[in-house]
Amino acid sequence: MNRDWSWGFNQFGTIRRCNLIIEKSQASTGLSDADKKALVAEGKMLRAMTYYYIAKHCGRVIWADHVLAETDEFNLPLTESIDKTYDLILKDIDDAIAGLPETSLQGRINANAARALKSEVCLTAAAYSTDDTRKKSLFEQAVAAVDGIQGYTLDSNYGSMFNQDGARTSPEIILAQYYSKDNTNGAGTLMQEMLPNQSNKRLEDYGGRPFFNQDLVFECWLEHSPSQNLVDDYLVIDQITNQGVKWNESTQFVNNTTPLSNADVADMAVDAKELDDNSLAYQTNSNAPDVQINDFMYKNRDQRFYHSIQYDSCMFYNELITLHKGGNLHRTAVDGKTPGNGYIPITNYIWRKYIYVNAERIFWNNPTDYHYVIFRYGRALLNKAEALLGLAQYDASKVSSAVATFNRTRTTHGNLPPSIATSLADAWHDYKIERHVDLALEGDYYWSLLRWGMYGGEANHGKPAGDIIPELSSPATFVEISQDRHRMFVGTVGY
């Protein structure tokens, strides 16, 4: 943070608008008492959301609880501690819960949204507190907040929550921000930076295949793509044991492939640095044309994988997406040698989550409806599971309750067998995977890693509280699949 970059601290224009809502509503002579109560509560909820954003970045904040006038003292102090910051935020949330209606129009805040926010704020507050009694109370408050949510259920069609199908009908969405095609184009949404840019002319020049049925069906400005690190956490159902395991640990993968050395796949790498001590490489045991390593990697996955990720040989927008060497959207599919060049995915994966399937392609000036999910019941349940894992430090019986709670999203969203974890360490392991995949692309993982690092212990690989977080020290990885789909390796992304 410096004079040119606020690192999220400078939200005071937003805070002023929240305070205006509160004060103008309270002073109104035209509003009913019921309307005043609801609007004041809405203002406090918005203020809490804004300060939570600042607190996650900075810890201590400058708390402004009224509209500042020109004659006011502007040399306001920081909160004396992080604990005090979260006390103020939680007070606003509790006031909001008391004043908000239980139900509301879509896109409008209600008391259940405030409870969902409280559950997550309590987790973060507990992570940054050194008071053991306070931590326990915060975990208990998080559980109670989620238990208080009424009228929402998990959506068995996970992907629909994030596209046109379930935007306004999903039983899981508590609060979302909606955009209308009347005043929204592709460039005004995340889709513009999540989809690639490729033409049949470029495919012809580079030698990639197959051609697209609709030329330029993908003509966006891709800025980021899912990493293999994320894909690793979408578990596979082992066809012998019926347990959820990592893709390269399943019986069907182990029995049909052979590990390779880096030297065995060096010809597939664009740069020798892509292969290192952490690389994985395999080949199929059979060279028959109808045997492909993709089948052993991508079949029988957590269902959220198919709703979230475009991968080699999947269909999207009525197009066959090929991300193997020589594929139409392979990481070098512009010039055959430069990964990620020309808005092509550098990891050989593309986002599917949060992509609408419209009659017209996603394009910068094509109108589109859109929405962002802010609070949903599944996320709240995962917050409850984490709070129960926190309480397991004081009461070991909470482990089974935590596992039962995160198994609800694991089985309903992922169609996976339930976790059978019984120890606190195993429960944390399975919970972290579950949160990673269920909340992918929802602005959660980085902040969760920080929180788990501050908890320490089983939440961060047995390390002391505040120690190094291994996931933040690990390089991003990609997958490379040979043109005949008999070999593959996982390599390190070069920047």
What are these language model-derived features?
Residues 1-58, 74-87, 91-106, 251, ...:
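Conserved, well-structured interaction surfaces
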Residues 2-5, 279-411:
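C-terminal substrate/ligand-recognition segments
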Residues 11-12, 88, 162-249, 326, ...:
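Long, intrinsically disordered, low-complexity segments
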Residues 17, 21, 85, 92, ...:
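Alpha-helical solenoid repeat scaffolds, predominantly canonical TPR units
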Residues 29, 55-62, 104, 121-133, ...:
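Short coil/turn linking the two alpha-helices of tandem helical-hairpin repeats
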Residues 112-115, 120-331, 459:
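An aromatic- and glycine-enriched ligand-binding surface/loop that stacks and positions planar moieties
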